[in-house]
C-alpha cells in the first residue's frame, strides 16, 4: 500500500520512543530515509538506530531541543544536508509539560508548554518549507507536513491541562492557515489526532483512573501506538493521499466522534 514511501526523506521529531518510534518503524519497513530526533544521544538511541536499520530504513539521528528556535533551524539544516532534501516533515515532538490550574499558571509554565508544543512545530515547519517546496517541484508530486494533534484540542483537556489542550488546538488551526498559503506549492498539511493511547503520557495515572477512562471509550480500551502509526504513513504517501490536505484524522476508538 505504501510502496511509494521507498527512498522518501522523512524527518520525524520526537521519535526515539512511543508513537514517534512506532511511526519510524512503519517508514523503515518501506525503505524510507528517516531522520529521528530527541534532545540528546544515548544508548537507547543507538539501539533504535540498529532496530530501524534492520527493518530496512536508511536512518540517522539528529539531536535538538526544539523548544529553541535556533535548534529547530539547525535540525532542518543538518537533516537536509545529510539526505539532500526533505519530502515529509512529521511534527511529533511535544508533551503535557506538567499540570497547573488557571490560578497557578505563571509565565514559566505557560512558556514551557507553548514552546514544547507550539514553537517546536511552528519553527521546524518554517525552516522546512523551502525544502518541501523544492521536493514537490522536483518530483511533480506533493510533499507534506503531518503534525501530531490531540483529542484534547477538541474537548479542552483534563483539569490542569488547559494550556496543553490550547496548544494542540492552535496546531490544529494553524494547519488550516498553512493549507491556504502553501497549496499552490503542492505542500499538504494534515493532522493525526490521537485519543487516549497507551503511552508514557499516562504513566502518572492510577490503574483505577485508567480503567474509568477506558470505560468511557466506546471500544473499551486505550489505543496502541501501532494502531496510530499507519495513519502517518497514509498521509505521507502521495499515492494514498495526494489530494488530501487540511484534514484532522481522529484515532480515538470512538471517544469523540465528529
Q: Can you name each region flagged by the protein language model?
A:
Residues 16-18:
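Conserved glycine-rich cofactor-binding loop
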Residues 30-46:
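Conserved glycine-rich Rossmann-like NAD(P)H-binding loop of the short-chain dehydrogenase/reductase
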Residues 77, 116-139, 179-180, 184, ...:
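Amphipathic alpha-helical dimer-interface segment in Rossmann-like NAD(P)H-dependent oxidoreductases
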Residues 85, 183, 188, 240-245:
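Short, small/polar-rich loop/turn modules that mediate ligand/substrate recognition or access, typified
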Residues 137-170, 175-184, 196:
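Catalytic loop of short-chain dehydrogenase/reductase
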Residues 221-251, 256:
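C-terminal substrate-recognition "lid" of short-chain dehydrogenase/reductases
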Residues 103-123, 146, 171:
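Catalytic Tyr-X3-Lys loop
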Residues 100-102, 106-114, 202, 209, ...:
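Substrate-binding pocket helix/loop in short-chain dehydrogenase/reductase
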Amino acid at each position: 500500500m505504501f510502496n511509494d514511501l521507498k527512498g522518501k526523506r522523512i524527518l520525524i521529531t520526537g521519535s526515539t520512543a512511543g508513537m514517534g518510534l512506532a511511526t519510524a518503524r512503519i517508514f523503515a519497513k518501506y525503505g524510507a530515509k528517516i531522520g529521528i530526533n530527541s534532545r540528546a544521544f544515548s544508548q537507547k538511541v543507538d539501539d533504535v538506530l540498529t532496530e530501524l536499520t534492520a527493518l530496512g530504513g536508511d536512518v540517522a539521528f539528529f539531536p535538538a531541543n526544539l523548544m529553541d528556535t535556533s535548534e529547530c533551524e539547525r535540525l532542518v539544516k543538518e537533516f537536509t544536508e545529510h539526505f539532500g532534501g526533505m519530502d515529509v516533515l512529521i511534527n511529533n515532538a511535544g508533551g503535557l509539560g506538567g499540570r497547573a490550574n488557571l490560578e497557578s499558571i505563571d509565565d514559566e509554565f505557560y512558556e514551557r508548554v507553548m514552546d514544547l508544543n507550539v514553537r517546536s512545530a511552528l519553527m521546524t515547519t518554517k525552516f522546512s518549507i523551502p525544502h518541501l517546496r523544492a521536493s514537490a517541484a522536483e518530483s511533480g508530486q506533493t510533499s507534506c507536513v503531518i503534525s501530531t494533534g490531540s483529542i484534547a484540542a477538541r474537548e479542552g483537556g483534563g483539569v490542569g491541562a488547559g494550556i496543553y489542550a490550547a496548544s494542540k488546538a492552535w496546531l490544529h488551526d494553524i494547519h488550516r492557515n498553512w493549507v491556504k498559503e502553501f497549496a499552490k506549492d503542492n505542500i499538504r498539511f494534515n493532522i493525526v489526532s490521537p485519543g487516549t493511547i497507551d503511552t508514557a503520557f499516562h504513566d502518572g495515572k492510577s490503574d483505577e483512573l485508567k480503567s474509568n477512562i477506558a470505560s468511557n471509550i466506546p471500544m473499551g480500551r486505550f489505543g496502541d501506538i501501532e494502531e496510530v502509526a499507519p495513519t502517518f504513513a497514509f498521509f505521507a504517501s502521495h499515492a494514498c493521499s495526494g489530494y488530501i490536505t487540511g484534514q484532522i484524522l481522529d484515532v480515538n476508538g470512538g471517544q469523540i466522534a465528529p
